[in-house]
Amino acid sequence: HGYTYCYFRQKGEKEIKLCGSKSERQGFTIFAVDMKDDKFIIRKDVEGLALSAGQEYEIFDIAIIKGDMDDVMDKYFFDFVGCKKPAIEHLSGYTSWYNYFQNINEEIIIRDLNGLDRASEEVNIFQVDDGYQAAGGDWLVTDHKKFPKGMKYIADEIHKKGYKAGIWLAPFSAQVSSMIAKKHPDWLLRHNRNGKKMLGCQGWGGAYTIDIYIPEVREYIKKVFNEVLNVWGFDMVKLDFLYSQCIEPRNGKTRGEIMCDGVDFLREVCGDKWILGCGVPLGTCMGIFDACRISCDVNKNWKFELK
């Protein structure tokens, strides 16, 4: 099974047949193949949807396109979904995550920035990942023991090298121990079933999710991005754990509609700055984000073995 779109190719043939949803706003689209009963099944996740009496609501808008792989993909993404030509033609560079995870500081970042001069590949971005902030959710409170000169200094040093400056955030997350979670418990999402605070991710020992439909939350997120992009001067944001916003449906909206609302809001507050999505359903950000991480963490060993 899969989500948003899928394609088939008969053995020995070059042509493919693609089935894809135009939008996930109505609800996430699930494609499944039942090999036992020889069935191809298309479902929409509309749990939580509330309609008024007599209201019409389009559930499915599906394209079926057959032909050469490149032509089919162009017709689906550009003509049907409405994606525009990517703003980024080539994105290659450095991220602190895979070498250090959260164990970064100013000395490490500046050392690696200077060391990138020796890279043989074309590099156009240098991205600082998790570990600069005092707590997840308190994005404007830098850990000054690790980064005594602050994050504007880091962005400035990256620009001096001629690279775009990138930084990681999880804008919908609030670490359990963060000031935001303690000061604004009314901002936190709660389970529909029992009203308990919802953990949106397990990072930092657990993090809650702040509700984007609360006006004060939206203002806080706008303030964060204004500081990061316009004061600190970063050019790209890597936005993580975005799925946490749509774990459960609410307010009469499906999970898909909630995620689309969240993605649209992030594009609004980021303007024309680059967005690299991470931990986000891909169908909701096609044509809106500039790029997406599509894999798990890269490591030199397997932490979990199937036995």
Could you describe each region identified by the protein language model?
Residues H1-R193:
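Conserved structural scaffold segments of CAZyme catalytic domains across common CAZy folds
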Residues E122-K307:
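Aromatic- and carboxylate-enriched substrate-binding clefts and catalytic-loop regions
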